Amino acid sequence: MRMIPLTLALALSGGVATSALAQDAAAAKALASKNACLACHAVDKKLVGPAYKDVAAKHKGQADALAKVSARIKSGGSGMYGPVPMPAQPNLKDEEVRVLAAWILAGAPDQ
């Protein structure tokens, strides 16, 4: 699991084979499903929370995007995407938070 953020980052720069990215994306999506993230978020449309593609677009080009999205996942908050607060996710391990944040910032790819 520790290679997922690295693999996604390399994929964004064009340095990783598609099959490795597909495996990492599938693992990240499974983690999102297991932790009920997909109850409030979808990849390309707003549900209760913002679409993952909108989150990726909002943070595109920001050097601290991974840290910001990771903090939002772990601590929750409100006001950034509307009035509905995102609950904190204190039970997620830091590595799981980074995996989810990297996947979201990559546009939550299936492959």
Set out the residue ranges of the language-model regions.
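Positively charged n-region of N-terminal signal peptides that target proteins for export
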Residues: M1-T7
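Bacterial N-terminal signal peptides
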Residues: T7-G15
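Sec/Tat signal peptide C-region and signal peptidase I cleavage site
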Residues: V16-A22
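Sequence/structural segment immediately N-terminal to covalent heme-attachment motifs in c-type
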Residues: D24-V43
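Axial heme c-ligation environment in periplasmic c-type cytochrome domains
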Residues: A39, K45-H59, R72-V99
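Short microdomains enriched in Cys/His and/or Lys/Arg
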Residues: K58-K68
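A residue-level marker of the well-folded mature domains of exported/periplasmic proteins
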Residues: A108-P109
